[in-house]
């Protein structure tokens, strides 16, 4: 597979990286890093816009507001959202925004304690946790979210997207495309045990 090139764009308050075409996935990472192999794999089938949070971004709620404005400035009206690590809270605040037209939410190795307000969100969500992740964060998020699916990614710790990019991309795409039916996969997942 050819390497996907992410382009950096000025979108008001943020500098997201973007690649791919088609339906949009907005990814919010909590590590301030560049797009990963998992993002490249997502961009092979969808348009992917990656926002990397840093310590200077303020609260998750403030970051979500800025990201929502940046996504709107890029002309995106409807999208799915993926929050990774500390980016999970910003992803959920974005999903909670009344003006956001979001399909589904994937939280990959969510970090921290979720806000109780997230329990009111009626959007379909998937929490991915690695089997080597010793934190209870995934369980906390899964328990709070009312329409939440939970899936373990084998042989992965908290850096789930870096450690198992193919598995994360495969599962996320299945969920975004099939939502509640994604567990009945159209493809054999044996390559991602």
Question: Where are the regions that the model predicts?
Answer:
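N-terminal cap/lid segment of alpha/beta-hydrolase-fold proteins
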Residues: 1-13
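Conserved HGGG/HGGXW glycine-rich cap/lid loop of the alpha/beta-hydrolase fold
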Residues: 15-57
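Conserved loop-alpha-helix segment in the C-terminal half of the alpha/beta-hydrolase fold
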Residues: 40, 126-156
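Short beta-to-alpha linker loops that shape the active-site pocket of alpha/beta-hydrolase fold enzymes
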Residues: 52-56, 111, 156
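Conserved acidic catalytic loop of the alpha/beta-hydrolase fold
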Residues: 62-79
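Conserved hydrolase catalytic core segment
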Residues: 78-113
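Active-site nucleophile elbow and catalytic-triad environment of alpha/beta-hydrolase enzymes
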Residues: 110-117, 123, 132-136
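Catalytic active-site module of serine/aspartate enzymes centered on a nucleophile-bearing elbow/loop
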Residues: 148-149, 154-193
